[in-house]
Curated annotation (Swiss-Prot):
Keyword tags: Periplasm, Signal
Compartment annotation: Periplasm
Signal peptide start-end: 1-22
Family in the record: Belongs to the UPF0312 family. Type 1 subfamily.
Pfam families: YceI
Lineage: Bacteria, Pseudomonadati, Pseudomonadota, Gammaproteobacteria, Alteromonadales
Protein name in the entry: UPF0312 protein Sputw3181_1309
Organism from which the protein derives: Shewanella sp. (strain W3-18-1)
GO cellular component, one term: periplasmic space
Amino acid sequence: MKKQLLSALIGVSLLVPMAASAADYVIDTEGAHASITFKVNHLGYSYVVGRFNDFSGDFSYDAAKPTAMTVNVTVNTLSVDSNHAERDKHIRGEDFLNTGKFAKATFASTSVEDKGNGDLVINGNLTLNGVTKPLAIKAHAVGEGQDPWGGYRAGFTGTTTFAMKDFGIKMDLGPASSHVELDLVVEGVRK
């Protein structure tokens, strides 16, 4: 009797659909399928563009429940690269990133808003130059699926802008140069 009851319970449990849950992903920086690039207006005449070559992170994501998404990223600020060695040295210095004291920047999500059609707003806290402030990233879910190597991937793009002074960056190149624009491309491999 006990065996029949146990068998019946197992059988019923297999028929009940399992609830979808978020999958965990590691950001694919090894395969260069992710990037963090920046753009700053240079004196109102042009732009300085660059990137961070060394960062890592992870996220959890379920397309059926995008508001449950979480994101965590750590950036090695020493890896700043604007394609000009002297400028990079200045950016790493006390006028800007102050990497001697703060060699890392972090972003940790706090909430996600679903705007429909794959558009999201990822709210979180950015810690840069020893200062933590709220930051909203406008993001878009590009797609997800199996890769040719037997893994599963999900990808996103994102943009955000912040004022340098909000993060204790005191260098003043004028009002045209007061903000940083970040462009993000993230592809994650399911863990």
